[in-house]
Amino acid sequence: FVWKTDKAGRDFIGVACEGDGASLWWPNKDHPTEEPDSMAINVTVPSDIMCVANGKLRETIKTDVKTTYKWFVSNPINNYNVSVNIANYAVINDTIHSVTGIQPAQYYVLDYNEDVAREHFKEARYMMRSLEKFFGPFPWWEDGYKLVETPYLGMEHQSAIAYGNDFKTYDSGVRSIYGYIDYITLHETAHEWWGNNITACDGADVWLHEGFGMYTEVLYVEDRLGYPMSIHYLLERRKGIANRRAIVGPRDEYYWGFEDAYNKGAWILHTLRSVLDDDAIFFGILKGFQQEFSSQIVCTEDLVEYINNVTGQDYKPFFDQYIFDRRPPTLEYSLSNDKLFYRYTGILPEFSMPINVLVNKNEVRLQPTTVTQTLTIPDYATVQIMD
């Protein structure tokens, strides 16, 4: 539980327990592979405040002193996604034009933030349409889509997204150049697909949540502001890659690969997109994987097998290098008058990956190996490795 007070000195309470375990506050089999198939959440609070939880509100029983809120989740839900939020909330009702039709949305915010939130959360309409374009229908319309102001930064609580970013447009630094995009709303909503609809089988596979969540940010920037801006964002994220340990490590050992799961995970997906060199196939994989494994528990190997089946190619060596080993491949290259020399070093035996380069702004696709190869280029040409 997060126990805080709002600016008016009133109770402002939430729950965020990913990593620590939901069994801290309610009885469950606390493992990523275990999910209740539905959930009744009944909370009694003083009548001068409100409780918001996952799912839809079925009943409110009010007396002069106490009020009981009865929420119900109709779909399977991760243990750590079950949450309650208690505060002096105002409710903003909205509608979202989904691929499934016009759907209701609710935003629960501290009463003194109602006006700013009403304007700020208009972005959710564009965001939802964009994410449904990439991944298919929002999985939880049956339980609703809510943004709930919380006393902590944010969390992907299913059908009740926790929001605590103070209505900022991105957070700070380089992200502020994107203007109107709130990364908490975006990233946590992305987890409704990557994390909640499809759930990692173990903490070791958490990149399936966070890498896809981060790359969703990239895709949304691309959708709203264009591809060059999304590359700029990716380049900034690359600065945070550490490569100190494998993204996916041993399972059943409480190995959470959070360190590189976000930034490197996003870059791995972008690299895969480049290797495929066909956006129709790449985005078909994203949407198809969501449909094929909807409301299921998956491991990284399930994703690799799915990609192999769709493409007819073997991408296991690609993921062995980038996901199961901490060392990225190194491309060594040099220029000498009219020659470009290039090769890979530090790669696993079966690894193979093309590289796109610009030679005087003309795109050339190379297939490096551990043996030095030569490309003849115009004298004193400008060569740029493409991102």
What is each model feature region?
Residues A40, E119-Y126, S130, Q158, ...:
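Extracytoplasmic/secreted proteins, especially bacterial periplasmic and envelope-associated proteins
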Residues I41, K70, A90-E192, N196-D205, ...:
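Juxtacatalytic substrate-recognition/specificity segment
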Residues V52, Y315-K316, L331, L335-M386:
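Beta-strand-rich binding/interaction modules
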